[in-house]
């Protein structure tokens, strides 16, 4: 099941009883997994602002399928899309409940990085076929300058970016890697992801106290 939920408030976004703390992952239903991956403390709607400039890296493709019409293979140009069409979920891909929901295999990256996945109708930052190594490196340097994970005035800068392929549980997306060298704690209250992609600003706020899983802050 693949989903990309619309905007909801905290009171209606999460179930009254947080099933992820009440049930074993093996007992989660398909609907519960979809909720955890698309509308939960670890997966939130991004706030997207269109400013019409070109200050961030951009490729000519979209990372995921369009939900209502068209898809990444249709050749739809990002510049042809209405500003209102931009929509994305930011998912904390390295968080334990997300990995358990997706049955993700163990990875040494989990110990080293916070990994966030941007999924939805936004410009891709993936490599293009006609791009050489120098162009790819320059675009990544630009992306590093405009992408960060913030908490209490501190910034964790981008270490790496990769394309996340589509699977049975999620549309394709873009993975952003941030070093765990600056540890996040519940008392930090909030973590904010932000980036610029061509003509749009993307920002997503996570409330850390809501991201407790079986007694631990899971990021």
Could you describe each region identified by the protein language model?
Residues 1-14:
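N-terminal export signals
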Residues 14-219:
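PEST-like low-complexity, intrinsically disordered acidic/proline/serine-rich tracts
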């Amino acid at each position: 099941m693949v989903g990309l939920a619309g905007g909801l408030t905290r009171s209606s976004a999460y179930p009254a009883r947080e099933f992820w703390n009440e049930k074993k992952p093996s007992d989660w239903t398909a609907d519960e997994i979809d909720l955890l991956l698309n509308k939960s403390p670890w997966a939130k709607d991004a706030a997207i602002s269109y400013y019409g400039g070109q200050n961030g890296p951009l490729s000519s493709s979209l990372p995921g399928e369009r939900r209502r019409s068209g898809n990444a293979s249709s050749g739809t140009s990002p510049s042809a899309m209405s500003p209102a069409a931009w929509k994305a979920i930011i998912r904390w891909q390295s968080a334990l409940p997300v990995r358990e929901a997706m049955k993700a295999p163990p990875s040494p990256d989990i110990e080293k990085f916070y990994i966030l996945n941007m999924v939805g109708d936004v410009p891709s930052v993936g490599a293009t076929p006609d791009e050489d190594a120098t162009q790819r490196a320059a675009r990544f340097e630009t992306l590093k300058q405009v992408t960060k994970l913030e908490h209490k005035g501190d910034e964790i800068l981008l270490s790496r970016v990769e394309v996340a392929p589509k699977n049975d549980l999620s549309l394709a997306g873009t993975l952003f890697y941030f070093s765990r060298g600056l540890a996040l704690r519940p008392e930090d209250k909030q973590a904010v992801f932000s980036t610029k992609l061509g003509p749009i600003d993307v920002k997503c706020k996570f409330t850390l106290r809501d991201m407790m899983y079986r007694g631990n802050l899971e990021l």
